[in-house]
Amino acid sequence: MDETTKIAVIGGGAAGLMAAGTAASLGADVTIFEHMQYVGRKIGITGKGRCNVTNACTLQEFMENVPRNPRFLYAALSALTPDDTMQFFESLGVKLKVERARRVFPESDKAATIVNALRKYTQGAKILQEKVTSVTKEEKGFIINGNDARIYARSS
């Protein structure tokens, strides 16, 4: 093995960065695999470059606007409600504003504000600019192969 980590996160998008940051903040050894030039790249182009973070509504209101199979999303959305999302970003120092249709954006009107906050949140994690080519289950973890890296994520 080239390296060992406790937690491997495949994908440095919003969910990957939040998961990696949370694990790192709890003291875990975390490695993020991201095949793009840098983590959060797609976040930087959302909302026409402004990043619509969430909607300022209740979970019930949000679910009423899901066109198909809202029950599928219920467990995930109840674990991190729109209000939780706003509090999370505010705890990272991001000032938010609510616009028409209750869409929530960073006050700066720049998606880069969100990207930078998430990057700072993941400071304890190692980031590899690496495309994952395979994941193999082993007895006590996983082997994650990339184009130029091989990481063992141990399960104990």
Q: Model-flagged regions — what are they?
A:
Residues D2-A15:
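Beta1/beta-strand and adjacent pyrophosphate-binding region of the FAD-binding site
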Residues A8, A24-K48:
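Glycine-rich FAD pyrophosphate-binding loop
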Residues A24, L118-G124, I144-G146:
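Alpha-helix C-terminal capping segments
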Residues Q37-A125, K131:
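Conserved N-terminal/central alpha/beta ligand/cofactor-binding core
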